[in-house]
Amino acid sequence: MNASEYGDVPQNRERIYIVAFRDKKDYANFSMPLPMELKKTLRDVIDFEKKQDDKYYYSSKNCKFYKELKRDMKNKHTIYQWRRVYVRENKSNLVPTLTANMGTGGHNVPLILTDDNKIRKLTPRECFRVQGFPKEFVLPEQSNTRLYKQAGNSVVVPVIKRIADNIASAVKET
């Protein structure tokens, strides 16, 4: 199940979900959620306008591949990734699958071109938003490296909620 098709989050994240029941009647009443239209956009979960802390921005002073980023990142409405030797634009308007090692190196972190033409990586909060966490979710007091890892290891909240709602309905019917 892809998060963009089953969770209304702009992320390409395919996962297999296994649901089991002890009672065959509950199983007979259960069905996995159906695909849904993606309504949320990148700008619903990522703030392209607001100035973030300087540590999230790339420049010629702190990034050895900044010249390539600057040359190739032109679109302010999409996500980019540094792929070890080249810049990849995700033309699907979806964030690529967030990974647990986003905070440990430069090649897995989704990048954006902000509205004021600055290049930056997603903040931990934005990564959690891409996973479907609500705006008001309070992030734990941890290092950004740990927060990126937690976001990358997370399940997509709306997908899990839809599956759980279907489980509750199946059990309630028996």
Segment roles from a protein language model:
Residues 58-174:
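C-terminal target-recognition/interaction regions appended to catalytic cores
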